[in-house]
Regions:
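N-terminal catalytic cores of NTP/NDP-binding nucleotidyl/phosphoryl-transfer enzymes
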Residues: 6-15, 19-82, 197-230
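Secondary-structure transition/capping motifs at alpha-helix termini
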Residues: 19-22, 51-59, 85-92, 220, ...
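Intrinsically disordered or highly flexible coil/loop and linker segments, enriched in small
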Residues: 23, 118, 166, 183, ...
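Conserved short loop/turn motifs at secondary-structure junctions
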Residues: 31-35, 63-71, 94-103, 126-127, ...
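Active-site cores that bind ATP or allylic diphosphates and position pyrophosphate for catalysis
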Residues: 66-68, 74, 111-273, 327, ...
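A glycine-rich helix N-cap at a beta->alpha junction
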Residues: 76-103, 108-109, 116-119
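Long, charged, mostly alpha-helical binding arms that flank functional sites
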Residues: 253-330
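Substrate/cofactor-recognition hotspot
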Residues: 309-553
Length: 553
C-alpha cells in the first residue's frame, strides 16, 4: 500500500487493484520518442513511473517509441539514456525499442483484418478528415472502401508492406465506430506508408504502426500493468482499451493519465525547442537556458533538485503552471548546504595596498562551507598580496545613500584578511577609475581592531598574482512571457524571447584553487551566486542560480 509520503490518485488506483488481486506486480514504463531531448516535463513522467514502480517493489521499463522514422535518431537515444542514468532512474525492467516489435504489430494488424476489424483505405489525408466529420456536430460518413472483404484487405496490406504503393496512397484503419463522439474512435488509422529509412531497422520496413496502435501492443508484450501517461492522452484511452480488448482479451495493461508539468517562462514543445536549436538561437539542445535535462545539467542543476521539484509540484489530474523560481529555490537550498565557497571577482577593479610590501605574499585560511548545518569545518588557503582585485561595484567615489562598502576615506574589511581604508584612486584619460589605493591596518589580521571601531562592511577579493582568468555567463529566463501556452495561436513564439537571457562577463578573476574544478562541480562564489564550470567551453563558468530570491518554498 502507498504510504502517506507518497500517496496520490494514481497510487489509490493501484492500491485498489492490488487489494482486489487484479495484479500481482506493479510494472510501469517510460516510453519517450527519440526525436528530441528530454525536458523538465519529461522528468515528471520519469519520476512518476520510476517512483511508483520502486515504491511497490515492481518493475520500470525504458522503451524507445521509435515507430515514426522521420525525425528519430541515435543521437536522441543516447541523450535519453544519459539523462535517465543521470537522474538515477534505473530501468530495472529492461531497455526496449518499439521497433523491435514491428513484426508482432504487423501480425496483430493482420489478425484484425482477418476478423473484419480493420480495412485498407484509399482516401487521402484530406478526404479522410472530411469523411470523419468533427466533434462540433458534423457527422461522419463511411469511406467508400470500408466494406472491402477481409481477403481483399489482407492482399492490399501485404502489398503495402512489399512497397508497391507510395507514401499516403493507402492506410490501414481500424473499423470501430463512426458515430462515436470521440474522434479517436472514428475508424482511426493504425498503419501508414513511409518510405523512410529507420534508425535501427534500416529499409526493412516501409509501413509503420501508429502510436495509438503500437503503444498498447508494446505494453501488453512487456507485461506492463499500469500505463501512466500525461493528460493529452486521456481521449486516446478508449482506443488503447479497444486494442487491448480485441487483441488480448483482458483488462490490463490499464492506462491512466496525470497532468503535465508546465513551467513559467519556457516552452516544452519539441518543435519549438528544435527550431531554437536549428536556427542557432541557442547553443544546442544543452544550452543552459533550455528546459532540457541536458541543459539543466550543463547549467548546474542536480538530479535531486529536479525530482524534489517534481514531487513538490504535485501529481494531479489538472494542468497547472509552476513558477520556475520554485525549482531554483529547491536547488538553492541544496547548494547552500552542499556547495563549497570560493572567491570570484566578476567585474574587477584593482585595489593597491600601498603600505603592504610588494614582495610579500601571505595566505589566509578561508572556510570551505561556513554553513553550520553542513558540518564542514575544512578550510583552504587563499593568497594575499599588495595588489588585489575587488568588485567594481564595491567602490563609489560618490556613494549612494546607505552604501556600506568602499569609498574615499572609508574603511572596510577584506573578507578573512585586513581592514583597509581608501586613500585615493587612479583614473584613465576618460575619468574612469582604473585603480584604487588603500592602506591596511596590519594589526587586524583575521580580527577586529584593538580600539573596537566599527567597519562599514566586508568585501571579497583575490590576489592579482594568484588568480585565474575566466568568462562568466549569467543566465536569466529564456522567454519574457510567463505562460507561453497562453500566447495567441497566430503568434510567433520567438517574438517572446528574452533579449537579456544571458549576460557574458569577460575577464572575471577567480581564486587559484579553482584550477582543478571540473564540470559537475558546484560552488558558491561568495556574494555572487552559485556557479559551475561549463561542460563545453573551458574557462567558462555558468551561474546556476542567484544567492537569494524573493520566492519562498
Amino acid at each position: 500500500m502507498a504510504d502517506e509520503k507518497f500517496s496520490n490518485f494514481l497510487t489509490d488506483i493501484i492500491d485498489a487493484d492490488l487489494a482486489e488481486g487484479k495484479v500481482d506486480v506493479v510494472h510501469t514504463r517510460f516510453p519517450p520518442e527519440p526525436n528530441g531531448y528530454l525536458h523538465i516535463g519529461s522528468a515528471k513522467a520519469i519520476f512518476i513511473n520510476y517512483t511508483i514502480a520502486k515504491h511497490y517493489g515492481g518493475l520500470f521499463n525504458l522503451r524507445f517509441d521509435d515507430t515514426n522514422p522521420a525525425r528519430e535518431g541515435d543521437e536522441y537515444v543516447q541523450s535519453i539514456l544519459q539523462d535517465l542514468k543521470w537522474l538515477g532512474a534505473e530501468p530495472n525492467g529492461g531497455i526496449f525499442y518499439g521497433s523491435d516489435y514491428f513484426e508482432r504489430c504487423y501480425e496483430y494488424a493482420e489478425q484484425l483484418i482477418k476478423e473484419g476489424k480493420a480495412y485498407v483505405d484509399d482516401l487521402t489525408r484530406e478526404e479522410m478528415q472530411e469523411y470523419r466529420g468533427n466533434d462540433a456536430g458534423k457527422p461522419s460518413r463511411p469511406s467508400p472502401y470500408r466494406d472491402r472483404t477481409p481477403e481483399e484487405n489482407l492482399d492490399l496490406f501485404r502489398r503495402m508492406r512489399a512497397g508497391e504503393f507510395a507514401d499516403g496512397e493507402k492506410t490501414l484503419r481500424a473499423r470501430i465506430d463512426l458515430a462515436s463522439p470521440n474522434m479517436n474512435m472514428r475508424d482511426p488509422t493504425i498503419y501508414r506508408i513511409k518510405h523512410v529509412e529507420h534508425h535501427r531497422q534500416g529499409d526493412k520496413w516501409c509501413i509503420y504502426p501508429m502510436y495509438d496502435f503500437a503503444h498498447p501492443i508494446q505494453d501488453a508484450i512487456e507485461g506492463i500493468t499500469f500505463s501512466l501517461c500525461s493528460l493529452e492522452f486521456e481521449n486516446h484511452r478508449p482506443l488503447y482499451e479497444w486494442v487491448i480488448t480485441n487483441l488480448f482479451g483482458k483488462e490490463f495493461p490499464k492506462q491512466r493519465e496525470f497532468a503535465r508539468l508546465n513551467v513559467t517562462n519556457t516552452v516544452m514543445s519539441k518543435r519549438y525547442l528544435r527550431e531554437l536549436v536549428e536556427k542557432n538561437i541557442v547553443d544546442g539542445w544543452d544550452d543552459p537556458r533550455m528546459p532540457t535535462l541536458s541543459g539543466l545539467r550543463r547549467r548546474g542543476y542536480t538530479p535531486t533538485s529536479i525530482f524534489t521539484f517534481v514531487k513538490e509540484a504535485g501529481i494531479s489530474k489538472a494542468d497547472n503552471l509552476v513558477d520556475m523560481r520554485q525549482l531554483e529555490a529547491v536547488l538553492r537550498a541544496e547548494l547552500e548546504l552542499n556547495a563549497q565557497r570560493r572567491v570570484a571577482v566578476l567585474e574587477p577593479v584593482k585595489l593597491i595596498i600601498d603600505n603592504y610590501p610588494a614582495d610579500q605574499c601571505e595566505y589566509f585560511d578561508l572556510p570551505n562551507n561556513p554553513n553550520r548545518d553542513a558540518n564542514d569545518t575544512t578550510t583552504r588557503k587563499v593568497a594575499f598580496t599588495k595588489e588585489l582585485w575587488i568588485e567594481n561595484s564595491d567602490f563609489f567615489e560618490v556613494p549612494p545613500p546607505k552604501f556600506k562598502r568602499l569609498t574615499l576615506g572609508s574603511e572596510v574589511r577584506l573578507m578573512g584578511a585586513y581592514l583597509v581604508r581608501c586613500t585615493g584612486v587612479d583614473k584613465d584619460e576618460n575619468g574612469k577609475v582604473v585603480a584604487i589605493h588603500a592602506e591596511a591596518d596590519l594589526e587586524t589580521r583575521n580580527g577586529n581592531p584593538a580600539d573596537g571601531r566599527k567597519v562599514r562592511g566586508t568585501i571579497h577579493w583575490v590576489s592579482c598574482a594568484h588568480c585565474l582568468d575566466a568568462e562568466v555567463e549569467l543566465y536569466d529566463k529564456l522567454f519574457t512571457e510567463a505562460n507561453m501556452n497562453s500566447i495567441p495561436d497566430d503568434a510567433d513564439f520567438k517574438d517572446y524571447l528574452n533579449p537579456d537571457s544571458v549576460k557574458v562577463l569577460q575577464g572575471a578573476k577567480l581564486e587559484e584553487s579553482l584550477k582543478d574544478a571540473k564540470p559537475g562541480d558546484r560552488f558558491q562564489f561568495v556574494r555572487n551566486g552559485y556557479f559551475t564550470p561549463d561542460s563545453k567551453h573551458e574557462g567558462v563558468y555558468n551561474r546556476i542560480v542567484t544567492l537569494k530570491d524573493s520566492f519562498k518554498l
